[in-house]
Regions:
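Bacterial N-terminal signal peptides that target proteins for export
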Residues: 5-17
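C-terminal motif of bacterial Sec signal peptides marking the signal peptidase cleavage site
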Residues: 25-28
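Bacterial signal peptide processing site
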Residues: 30-32
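Terminal connector regions
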Residues: 38-42, 138-192
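Transition segment at domain starts
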Residues: 43-79, 176-193
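Short, solvent-exposed loop/turn segments enriched in Ser/Thr/Gly
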Residues: 80-87
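Asparagine-centered strand-capping/turn motif at beta-strand->loop junctions
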Residues: 90-97
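Intrinsically disordered, low-complexity Pro/Gly/Ser/Thr-rich segments with frequent PxxP/GP/PP motifs
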Residues: 112-146
């Protein structure tokens, strides 16, 4: 009798444990579904305002090279690759003045222009950010892809932060890294560091 009572108690705890595991699994699926929502509509390119550029008013600016990776090799062979989604981020760090972005070009490994991402000069307000996204299926840039970003300003300003973030969550593995931009050329007065 004691053994039967112990078995019933054990079966009860097993059932409760299975129900609890099911509930936790269901909650995890719901949480995962929430993380795949599209970004808010106010993010990205919508923070830019098209402007007419008057070159005589330009006081400072830069041309910035930003290395990006469409994919990377893994394991011990170049036959195995992980595709990466890329976000180019341009952040105006000046507290008072806007910058004007004049060029955002995307190049492949051989230095061939793939596409111009900016049609017209566009103003980025003080402390605002703009981003450009390339999906993980966009592999035409190759391992040595890059962006060339040009910006100018009508005031002496703090230089913007321009960088690329590469991400992959392929096969349940999370991989991400940042690639900072490198200034190739100063236009006009050098900006404060």
């Amino acid at each position: 009798v004691l053994q039967k009572t112990a078995m019933r108690g054990l079966n009860h705890w097993i059932k409760l444990s299975l129900i609890l595991i099911f509930i936790v699994s269901l909650a995890a699926c719901t949480l995962d579904a929430q993380t795949t929502q599209p970004p808010a509509p106010h993010l990205g390119k919508s923070t830019l305002k098209q402007v007419t550029l008057e070159s005589k008013k330009i006081l400072a600016g830069q041309t910035i090279y930003v290395p990006v990776y469409s994919y990377i090799y893994h394991y011990d062979t170049q036959n195995q690759v992980i595709n990466l989604a890329t976000t180019l981020s341009i952040r105006n760090t000046d507290l008072k003045h806007p910058i004007i972005i004049t060029k955002i070009d995307y190049y492949d490994t051989s230095g061939k222009l793939i596409k111009n991402l900016l049609e017209n000069p566009s103003e980025l307000s003080s402390m605002a950010s703009a981003d450009y996204f390339l999906s993980r299926n966009e592999v035409s840039g190759g391992l040595g892809a890059n962006f060339l970003v040009e910006w100018v300003a009508e005031h002496s300003i703090f230089e913007p932060v321009v960088e690329a973030v590469m991400v992959s969550t392929e096969s349940g593995r999370g991989l991400s890294f940042v690639s900072p931009g490198k200034v190739l050329k100063h236009i006009g007065a050098k900006t404060p560091a």
